């Protein structure tokens, strides 16, 4: 039997992604009711973190605990990875003992190589190219507040980064139109755009791009590893802040999302972050429920 991995949204069909979202909502209700539900009892998830994290670590650790399993935290300091052990060797060893591997790292090729040599499911918890777990939470959050996102129009404002790339994949998999508004020199990977071009439109002016959209999403201007570019990026992105004026260009029931952490006064104004149409806190909580559905799907029968 072939092993199922989750490296990008394209690893699952649209039907699987919808099933996963509905299951996440069910698991959320189960958890809120206080019912004990442990389909992953005696299962272990090895979590490899080469990038620091708040929401990812907490949500996966608590998720495994609530599902009856155990999560093992591994950093480069704790393993031979930090001393140069090949990824393929690490994958073979860890997958011979653990029931699943979650990895948060820099190069996407690291995750791909891990999956290639693993005997158990591998989950991409973020690379420089993609952040698919966040999209599971975002799509669940939109569904809970506004229903199906199919046929809607979403605006990504800011850096064409890993989150933007996953939104491009999501446009195809969930059936929405995606507008991307980024400064020159900060567009998403053209290869990823071209592969999904019928779902994606590039609009340089962010106020024009925001007109009549149903959801506006942004992220920090300087991601992890780009701190030295902070001043340069602040200058390049100064007209790309999501603020009240931009939200007023959108449809009256448009939502605002941000994967967090957010820098109020930079990529988003404090007013928008704390407004009624901001669902960032539900979005953050849904990392837990969406990933529980993913863990159950990949590991319960493995």
Curated annotation (Swiss-Prot):
Question: Per the UniProt entry, what are the Gene Ontology biological process annotations, in alphabetical order?
Answer: arginine biosynthetic process via ornithine; citrulline biosynthetic process; L-arginine biosynthetic process
According to UniProt, this protein's pathway is: Amino-acid biosynthesis; L-arginine biosynthesis; L-arginine from L-ornithine and carbamoyl phosphate: step 1/3
**Which reaction is the catalytic activity of this chain?**
carbamoyl phosphate + L-ornithine = L-citrulline + phosphate + H(+)
Q: Which UniProt keywords apply?
A: Amino-acid biosynthesis, Arginine biosynthesis, Cytoplasm, Transferase
The keyword Amino-acid biosynthesis appears for this protein = yes
Tell me which residues bind L-ornithine. 162, 219, 223-224
Residues crossing the lipid bilayer are none
Q: Which GO terms describe its cellular component?
A: cytoplasm
Q: Which GO terms of the molecular function aspect are on file?
A: amino acid binding; ornithine carbamoyltransferase activity
**Keyword Chaperone (UniProt):** no
Positions of carbamoyl phosphate binding: 53-56, 80, 104, 131-134, 259-260, 287
According to the UniProt entry, what is the EC number of this protein? 2.1.3.3
Q: Which PANTHER family match?
A: ORNITHINE CARBAMOYLTRANSFERASE, MITOCHONDRIAL, ORNITHINE TRANSCARBAMYLASE, MITOCHONDRIAL
Name-wise, this protein is: Ornithine carbamoyltransferase
Q: What is the species of this protein?
A: Hydrogenovibrio crunogenus (strain DSM 25203 / XCL-2)
